[in-house]
């Protein structure tokens, strides 16, 4: 009993010491937005409440697209399908479970993970619940649906693969993770019979989608500091496959390009990234943990430009909008940047709650969700100008 109370007092002292140390740290103020010369204006199409948001928790509940539908989720379990043009609700399903992972829509199905360690699969056309599976812990990343399989990545280092036909588990992978990690998980990407994902130990690995056999493994982050916090090396951003190459980035690590077939490096550059990457034919666009937006040459990894206008404004990952990239920030702004120069060319303020997750761009629309549970669908300014 005495030992128990001693341990509690010691733990309390450690917590107080850590809090005091945090209080002494310099907090970097978010950079004030500078005036810009806008090349085009951006107009709203419709706005709807999509359920209960919860600041940082809502950030992971990004929507999914399926044909003419936007499928959204809220933290209390409400799944909603909207018509992308009108904003009309097509169907609603309440799972009555707290959701913690983003929505995936593919092969006529919707999949979403819960805080209660389940993944639910619904019919994309009417929202009917078809089946669910139990995993080992809450699901923070979007599930993947590919080649007749559902692939789930959990923050305890595990990967589960299920048959869509039988709903049975086909294979399972377990990886030991560090004691201290970021709250987040790299989503699994399933393509061309391969599953790729990052882990909290700074490694990226590829697996055979059918058998679960590991094809290769590569480090993209390595512990560098002396303290446990400074040695966090999570790979939380989702890898991107482009033209037989894999692009990824880690926290306190590197941005990398590697051969998808064998994991060999094409290039590797210092970076600290937790947001999603954007890759096009010429460049890789990343947002680092300080809020810098950086464009790298896709083939060489050389820096093309860096934009520091959103320092410490918690910018989202970048979305592709023809000759521009789109990012959101913590005050609810969407920003358009020129892909060639990194200069700001347009801006719109949606609301004061902050943008949750990387925007989504289609031919006709730009879609953004806010951290308190709103969805904003804008007219794509490039589509409008092309029609005129």
Curated annotation (Swiss-Prot):
Subcellular location(s) per record: Cell outer membrane
Q: What is its main location?
A: membrane
Annotated Gene3D superfamilies: YVTN repeat-like/Quinoprotein amine dehydrogenase
Q: Where is the signal peptide?
A: 1-21
Residues with lipid group (N-palmitoyl cysteine) = 22
Q: Which cysteines are joined by disulfide bonds?
A: none
Q: Which GO terms describe its biological process?
A: Gram-negative-bacterium-type cell outer membrane assembly; protein insertion into membrane
How does this protein lie in the membrane?
Answer: Lipid-anchor
Matches recorded under Pfam families: PQQ_2
Transmembrane residue ranges: none
GO CC annotation: what is one?
A: cell outer membrane
The record, for InterPro entries, names: BamB (IPR017687), PQQ_b-propeller_rpt (IPR018391), PQQ_rpt_dom (IPR002372), Quinoprotein_ADH-like_sf (IPR011047), WD40/YVTN_repeat-like_dom_sf (IPR015943)
- Kindly list the residues that the UniProt entry marks as S-diacylglycerol cysteine lipid attachment points: 22
Q: What keywords are annotated for this sequence in UniProt?
A: Cell outer membrane, Lipoprotein, Membrane, Palmitate, Signal
Q: Which residues form a coiled coil?
A: none
**What does the sequence similarity comment in the record state about its family?**
Belongs to the BamB family.
PANTHER family for this protein: CELL SURFACE PROTEIN, OUTER MEMBRANE PROTEIN ASSEMBLY FACTOR BAMB
Quaternary structure (record) = Part of the Bam complex.
Its biological purpose: Part of the outer membrane protein assembly complex, which is involved in assembly and insertion of beta-barrel proteins into the outer membrane.
Q: What is this protein called?
A: Outer membrane protein assembly factor BamB
């Amino acid at each position: 009993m005495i030992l128990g109370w001693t341990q509690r007092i010691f733990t309390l002292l450690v917590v107080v010491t850590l809090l005091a140390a945090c209080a002494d740290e310099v907090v970097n103020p978010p950079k004030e937005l500078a005036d810009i010369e806008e090349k085009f204006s951006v107009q709203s199409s419709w706005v709807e409440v999509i359920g209960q948001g919860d600041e940082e928790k809502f950030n992971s509940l990004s929507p999914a697209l399926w044909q003419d539908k936007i499928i959204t989720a809220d933290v209390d379990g409400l799944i909603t399908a909207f018509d992308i043009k009108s904003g009309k609700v097509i169907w609603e399903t309440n799972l009555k479970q707290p959701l913690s992972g983003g929505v995936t829509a593919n092969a006529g199905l919707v999949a979403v993970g819960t805080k209660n360690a389940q993944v639910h699969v619904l019919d994309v056309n009417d929202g009917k619940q078809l089946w669910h599976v139990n995993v080992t812990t809450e699901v923070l990343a979007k599930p993947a649906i590919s080649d007749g399989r559902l692939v789930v990545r959990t923050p305890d280092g595990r990967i589960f693969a299920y048959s869509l036909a039988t709903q049975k588990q086909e294979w399972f992978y377990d990886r030991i993770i560090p004691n201290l990690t970021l709250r987040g998980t790299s989503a699994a990407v399933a393509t061309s019979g391969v599953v790729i994902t990052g882990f909290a130990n700074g490694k990226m690995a590829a697996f055979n989608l059918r058998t679960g056999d590991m094809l290769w493994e590569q480090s993209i982050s390595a512990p560098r500091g002396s303290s446990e916090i400074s040695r966090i090396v999570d790979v939380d951003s989702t890898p991107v496959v482009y033209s037989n190459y894999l692009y990824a980035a880690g926290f306190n690590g590197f941005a990398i390009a590697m051969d998808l077939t064998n994991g060999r490096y094409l290039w590797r550059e210092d970076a600290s990234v937790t947001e999603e990457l954007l890759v096009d034919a010429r460049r890789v666009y990343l947002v680092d943990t300080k809020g810098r937006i950086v464009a790298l040459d896709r083939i060489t990894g050389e820096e093309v430009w860096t934009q520091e206008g959103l320092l410490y404004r918690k910018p989202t990952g970048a979305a592709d909008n023809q000759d521009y990239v789109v990012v959101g920030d913590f005050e609810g702004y969407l920003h358009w940047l020129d892909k060639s120069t990194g200069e700001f060319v347009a801006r719109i303020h949606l609301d004061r709650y902050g943008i949750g997750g990387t925007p989504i761009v289609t031919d006709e629309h730009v879609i953004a969700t806010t951290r308190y549970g709103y969805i904003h669908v804008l007219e794509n300014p490039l589509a409008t100008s092309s029609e005129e």
